[in-house]
Every structure is written in structure tokens, then in C-alpha cells.
Amino acid sequence: MILIKNAQIVNSIDNKLEKADILIVDDKIEKIGKNIEENPDKMIIIDTSGKYVMPSFTDIHCHLREPGFEYKEDIKSGSRAALAGGFTTICCMPNTNPPVDNRAMIAYIKYRAKEVSPIEVLPVGAITKGLSGEELAEIGFIKEEGAIAISDDGKCVMNANIMRNALLYSKDFSIPVISHCEDTNLSEGGQINLGYVSTITGLRGIPREAESIIVARDILLAKETKAHLHITHVSTKESVRLIKMAKEWGVNVTADTCPHYISLTEEEVLGFNTNAKVNPPLRTQEDIEALIEGLKEGVIDCISTDHAPHHKDEKNVEFNLAASGTIGFETAFSVLFTYLVEKNGFDIGKIVELLNYNPRKIIGLSPNIIKEGEKANLVIVDLKKKWEVKEENIVSKSKNSVFLGKLLTSYVETVIYNGKILKKDGVLSC
């Protein structure tokens, strides 16, 4: 049994509870109430005075690199990194080697996760065979085997007819399509956002239209097919406007953005910082403001990390040769609190919705909620703690965080999943 004392519970922006004790028996919340009787001989007692307790988080877009790229990350190490950041459900993308484009690979991911992961790992299947963009994968079999979505993330399905057919099949099989929106004819050879910083550094720029053109195309295809389109890692103000328009039309579209897009601009690249090389690229302050407004209005539904680990040798090279991507599990909540709550006045309950309720709804899962009779999946956070992101404290195999050296506010201290304490006072126990 676990007894959490003096918990300030936050389930969502509309459903907050006053301070209470939480009694966990086995894997469920047995009781929530004032002054629950302590029994130190039978209970693990955690005093959360001055801290907040909220449902654990879900990430619908990450990369675990297994199979094929285990030197960057694997299911075990990636799951531990996610756990360190408060995530107990993560959805891994299919751009592995071989790609997750058939039912056997879906089965492998599920089996491997059950074997080595302390948390829930849900596979995303490919839209096309080999992520080639040329022939649809067997979407029905992929869904039947347990995929929660389909995506060619890392690559855009450039053929509009292939994408249209994918949406039609996805509707028949009731599975969302997660779209990586990038017109590669416009972005080819690009390194960073096309603009001031690309001009002064001499790095080839990626025009913002590379994203927004495909966003517009896929919205129109979703409008026609009535399928569920999810647009991932939104980075431009134009994309926000297009998604808002689509929702006003009644299109079945949802969207996410990532912590680095709502906090950092293209200027992070100055000095040729390869950790700031991500895809889509970091944009401008104007884009950040549009994304934040989109989150406030509900145009952008949730936050994903796009956790993209790379080996140090893939980043410690000339900028144009460096791999794109940043790790994100361990800093996600703190970045959102620092840049949305502290700097932009968001309610802490809104962050819980962006990391729990909304992403789970998108992939068809019921939300984690702190309530009697529900599974005990929760995190304890210290909202006042300030900490610097340092390589030596990163749990992930890879250390390529764009937030290295940044000072963040709030810290996920303790994580409980299915009634088990997997992280306590900052230390993982799995």
C-alpha cells in the first residue's frame, strides 16, 4: 500500500481537487480523502506538502530506434527516459530498420516492450511499405495486431493519391493517420528555417511553405474522406491558421506541437549548434506566439515530444552533415511549465490536458485520472524547483537535447505506474 499525504490534485483545467490524501492498494486508487489513517508498518508514506499530484503523461510521437538503431536508443532505455519525464504511455514511430510496416513488426515491438519496458509502449505502424511513399502497407493487419495509428513520420507521403487512399483505409479501420507535413521538393537540402539566421550563417534554408502546403493538402483530403487526420509537430503560424480553418469546416483533424517549438527560435542555431537542428526547423518568435495562441484556443490539441535520440558522433559534425532531432522526454513537462505557465499564464490544469487527456483521446484511450477505483498512474511534481539541463543527468542513451544548459522551473520527482513506484525523489527504481 502507498499513502500519499497532503496531495494538491490536478486532473484537468475544469476538475481540480483540494488537498487530500490518496490511498493506493495494489494497482488502483482505493480512497481519496482527508486525514486517511497512517500505518507505517503496512504503507509506504509519501508526504507531498507544497507539491502537486497529477495523472501521468502520454506521448503520441516519439522514436525509440529499435530495431536497427540501438546505438542511439532502444525500447528499454527510451522507456526509462520517458518515465523520468513522467510519461507512462508512449507511442513509438515506425522509422526503424526494418520499418514497422507489417503485423510481424508490430508484434515484435509489443513483445519487446512487454519484456523490457517498465511502462506502456504502443507501436505506430507505417502508412507505406518501407516508408517509401509508393505502396500502402497492410493497414488492416497492422491495426489488428495492435498499432494505435499509422504514420510515415520522418518522411512525407508526397503522392497525394497514396495519401488519399491511406485516409480512406484508415477510416474503414478506425485508425488515425499521423501526418509528417513536409514538401520535400521545397525542403530538399535545407538545414534550418529560411530567414535571417539562414542568411547570416550561410546555411541553406527550409521555407515555411514546405510545411503549410502539405498541411493544406492533407486537410483537404481529410475533408473529402472524412478520416481522422492528425498533423504532428506543427511549427508555423500558417499551419495553425489552416488547422483552425479546418476545424471550423468540421474536418476531423487534430494536431500537436512540441516543447521546443513553443519555446525556442531559429537563433538557437547561431554558433552552429547541431542540437538545435531539428525537423521541422525551429522558427521565429512570431511562430512561437501563434503556436501558444493555438494551444490556448484548442486549435492545437496536445503536446508530443518527438523524442529523437542520436549518437554524439551524429551531432558532433559539420552542421550540414548532422542528424536532425532533439531528445525530449525528460524536459517536456518542465519546458511547458516554464514557457506556458510561468511566462504565458497558462493554468497548470491545461498542461495536464495537453499531456494526458487530449493525446489519449486522439488515439482512442480513456484518460488517466486520479479518482477512486481508477488505476494508480500519477506523478508528483515540485513546481518551484529550478534545475539546469546537464548531460550527466540525462537518462536517455543519447544526450542531444536542445535544452542543454537551459534553466527550467518544475521537476517530476516521483512517478507511480499501476500502483508501483518507478521513480521516487528523482531516482529511478527500474
Swiss-Prot record:
- Which catalytic reaction applies to this protein? (S)-dihydroorotate + H2O = N-carbamoyl-L-aspartate + H(+)
Q: Which cysteines are joined by disulfide bonds?
A: none
What is the UniProt remark on how the cofactor binds and its stoichiometry? Binds 2 Zn(2+) ions per subunit.
> Which parts of the sequence bind substrate?
63-65, 95, 279, 310
Which species does the entry assign this protein to?
Caldicellulosiruptor bescii (strain ATCC BAA-1888 / DSM 6725 / KCTC 15123 / Z-1320) (Anaerocellum thermophilum)
Protein name, please? Dihydroorotase
Matching PROSITE patterns, A to Z? Answer: DIHYDROOROTASE_2
The domain of life is: Bacteria
Tell me one GO biological process term.
purine nucleobase catabolic process
Q: What does this protein do?
A: Catalyzes the reversible cyclization of carbamoyl aspartate to dihydroorotate.
- Which cofactors does it use? Zn(2+)
Residues annotated to bind Zn(2+) 1: 61, 63, 153, 306
Q: Where is the active site?
A: 306
The residues that hold Zn(2+) 2 are 153, 180, 233
